[in-house]
Amino acid sequence: RNYGGIAYDYYGYNISVIDLRNPLFSDGNNMLHMVNKYMDQYKQNRNDLSLKAKTEKYAKIIAKTIIFSDGESASSYGQNSFFYDSAEGLLTSIILIISEFCDDGERHIVSVFKLVQDLLKPSGIKGKTQFQILLDYLPDNHKAKWFAGAALNTGEQAMMSVLSTVLSRLN
């Protein structure tokens, strides 16, 4: 099932296997490493906005890589492009939230996966999703809200579709 060894031995490729369903069978690689690195540096020096920009840049790269893993862009999905664009923004914002607010041992892609699963649960508040409730705790100028833009301002059903898109891409 894991052809990484064959690709390395015979073709010289260095392959990393990331299996979110079975993390113990994955290679030891934290996809959020660069995001966490620059977030930690930014927390030490809040005046250096270039560190914050690098954090956001790497979060966006990870989200784009996961959502558009087939190499296509959102425009090639036709009527579904809204959901894929929104899913990318939502995933970027969740990565930033995990990196900023979780403890060191919890800042990895599995925590992102788990948070997305938790956000799919009903909120109990009519007209509000779990994601909207989560982002209400953040200041108005927090970048996670900016990245979530389109997904944050949709109805409950559309938001569930966006979350399902993210979850399907993380699987």
Q: Residue locations for each model-derived region?
A:
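P-loop NTPase motor domains
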Residues: 1-171
